[in-house]
């Protein structure tokens, strides 16, 4: 995919850089693989705001994406590549030999007409899924399970990938984009290749309205608020906040480590923070 820039006939087009999606399918999604999606506006079941700066945006329908690749050893053909408003990656509509349709995450270098398959002993080619124990060391992968049968959780956003760098006592060693090295069971499935739409990292919205179309409201800084609204608020003139960055509720933020899942610490061989030293 290439990037598109525009002749600035309006101010909003001067900085605008978007992904060229001309090669994607232009029709509607498959009705049996979609369902309605209601906009929550960052509210919970009590109507209270639990996620700030969300709301509005274009209406969406949710596409059921198969992260488990549940149909094993049945070849499928890629019917088309589609845009999905619920994720940064593109999705591929595949048709199995028995006629069943399914959506999967589209990897890079997957084209219409290609054949994909999920199974224990399949070729190493983009879109094919197999257990980590059956892959050669060095393979670039995405949509990696953390527990066998749970469905892919690691490396699912646009351009993301992990690399199989070794094996150890029934576990596979993965290097993630963040620099973290992690142990995952060799029985976990993963898909070969990197996720599509790597140019997503280079887009520029060009205007505030394009963020609003996505359901993002203005992100107000604490130093621009009053003391009643934020610990950084108030002061005469412009201030730096006067203290280390905190959330509106006084909790340290911006770099403060929040990981507290000690049960899974044993699966992290090298943290993402170590490469920064």
Swiss-Prot record:
Stretches for region Disordered: 222-277
GO cellular component: large ribosomal subunit
Stored InterPro entries: NA-bd_OB-fold, Rib_uL2_dom2, Ribosomal_uL2, Ribosomal_uL2_bac/org-type, Ribosomal_uL2_C, Ribosomal_uL2_CS, Ribosomal_uL2_dom3, Ribosomal_uL2_RNA-bd_dom
MF terms in GO: rRNA binding; structural constituent of ribosome; transferase activity
Domain of life from the UniProt record: Bacteria
BP GO annotations: cytoplasmic translation
UniProt xrefs under Gene3D superfamilies: 2.30.30.30, Nucleic acid-binding proteins (2.40.50.140), Ribosomal protein L2, domain 3 (4.10.950.10)
Signal peptide start-end: none
Pfam families found in the cross-reference section: Ribosomal_L2, Ribosomal_L2_C
UniProt keyword terms in alphabetical order: Ribonucleoprotein, Ribosomal protein, RNA-binding, rRNA-binding
Family note: Belongs to the universal ribosomal protein uL2 family.
Subunit structure: Part of the 50S ribosomal subunit. Forms a bridge to the 30S subunit in the 70S ribosome.
Functional description taken from the UniProt entry: One of the primary rRNA binding proteins. Required for association of the 30S and 50S subunits to form the 70S ribosome, for tRNA binding and peptide bond formation. It has been suggested to have peptidyltransferase activity; this is somewhat controversial. Makes several contacts with the 16S rRNA in the 70S ribosome.
Protein name, as recorded: Large ribosomal subunit protein uL2
Organism: Bartonella henselae (strain ATCC 49882 / DSM 28221 / CCUG 30454 / Houston 1)
